[in-house]
Amino acid sequence: ITATVMQIESCGDPYAQSSAGATGLFQVMPFHFAHGENSMDPETNALRGLNYLAKALEYSGGNARLALAGYNGGIGVIEKSEFNWAAETVRYAYWGSGIYADASQNSSTSARLDEWLRAGGASLCKNARERLGILPQQ
């Protein structure tokens, strides 16, 4: 589930920044960092992001789909009906749970990952490749 979150959040780009203010590999919001912590430091960002993901997994009783929704929309989302989730959270849980399920089954392909890429993920990954100096696959 860790790799799924990092894929959706940043495509592995430790310098990713969102318009909402989230930063780094796990797109962690500023209020999750202690004063003086560097949110762009991959280790610090991963620590804060994974702590929040662990909290979401705990609150969801280990339900990956609910934990993904909580990671994206806030822990309180876990207790709400999906009908009350923000559209972004619904999409995040949909893509994330499918990508995670495929990875958990050691699938060599993922229709859900392909769908996420077509829905905008490819642009995120292209930006990550360019920023990190990684050539696209031929």
Enumerate the predicted regions with their spans.
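Surface-exposed patches in mature extracellular/periplasmic domains of secreted proteins
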Residues: I1-A3, A16-Q17, Y59-G70, S107-S110
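Short, functionally critical alpha-helical segments immediately adjacent to catalytic or ligand/cofactor-binding
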Residues: I1-D13, A46-L50, A67-G74, G96
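Substrate-binding/active-site groove segments that recognize
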Residues: Q17-G36, R48-G49, Y92-G96
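N-terminal secretory targeting signals
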Residues: A103-Q138
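Catalytic and substrate-binding regions of cell-wall glycan-acting enzymes that process beta-1,4-linked
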Residues: A34, A67-L117
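Short acidic, glycine/proline-rich loop/turn micro-motifs
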Residues: S18, S39, K80-E82
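A short, structured beta-strand-centered segment in the mid-to-C-terminal lobe
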Residues: E37-N45
